[in-house]
Amino acid sequence: SGKTTTLAAMLDHVNTFRRENIITIEDPIEYLHKDKKSTISQREVGMDVQMFSRGLRACLREDPDVILVGEMRDLDTIETALLAAETGHLVLSTLHTLDAPESINRIISVFAPHHQRQVRLQLSSILRAIISMRLVPRMDGQGRVPAVEVMITTPYIQECIAEKEKTGLIRDAIAAGVSQYGMQTFDQSIYQLYRDGYISFEQGMKYSTNSEAFKLRVMGIQSTLDIALEEMEKSMSKVERFEEGEGAKEE
């Protein structure tokens, strides 16, 4: 689904432009990286380390700046990855989930119920972004094109992660943060791919999270959800401007 290639591209960007100590733990290693501005050490599960969690714990003793964990498969790996991020490391990893809200719920759900409240608070403070991807067949038959959901952890989304009853609001917050934060939902991405002529209407309907809303957008009709999101985006902008103004006063 493009996860490995996307991670490799992100890692190459860091390697090209920043002086960092990078350690990767992968299963298997699919892209070989050479040192550029950064130094990079790649380790393969089954060859260099026994499992993701053990490799992750071992690399923390080597003072890495950036850690790539090929996949967070179990509680031990997720718990160690959260600890690594909490102690100042940039941690990049993947999950087999559909979108940002499901990724957040997956991370939290692997912990025992009596620990989940603390994990929510921890995750809300360290998570920086979630990128989700669906590969949609191109209309011209030349392979597939990625529909991409991007969630940036804004103060409001931090609040939604920390409070269980607000997690369901994350998707709407992503949709409302297009112009201000550069976020987008799958449905917004798929609609843009359709408008740009990359995918057919049928594929747009098939891969959309809310196919009825996609159909209404194509017909030029605003759904009640679209109207609500526009109002939400305006409200978020007002709050952001207010917070910036208050910060300026304090300075």
Describe the predicted segments one by one.
Residues 1-251:
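Short, flexible helix-loop junctions that flank or precede catalytic/ligand sites
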